[in-house]
Amino acid sequence: GDQIHLGAKVFMFTEYKILAPVVLVLVIACGFSPLGWYTAMAIAVGALSSAIAGFIGMYSATQANVRTATAAENSGAESALSISFFGGSIMGLCVASMGLVGLGGLYFYFTGAMDDPDKIAKALEGFGVGASAVALFSRVGGGIYTKSADVGADLVGKIEAGIPED
């Protein structure tokens, strides 16, 4: 379990190191566009919120994996299902919480900085752009990471252990 957790953590840090310059270019390009710096700030906050939610979700899921396997072995399927359900619900609650805190904080800030409700709404749209950019990269990168781990496990099973193809 520790190896899975460590591998997932290394993947997340590597992914975010690659993603940070992409988000930075997006923020700077938006800042110099007619959309303005308020929208650029919302993009940055949305990207940060999504990245934090993704990291917390990955951390909790890898921790829940070990606990679920242990519970299945020692206590049976009911206990394992309960642990896996609550371990997975952390991600959903974290995404909703980060969205509410991020959008709420931006709305509070923008209503004090701007008078026009249309400009506030346009600026808040940047939050979704930033969050979606990180989610897209995480989805695609995570799929590639998962497939490469699957292929590696298949090769080890066939070559090292002599396990036939399933």
Where are the predicted features?
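Hydrophobic, small-residue-rich transmembrane alpha-helices and their short perimembrane loops
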Residues: 1-166
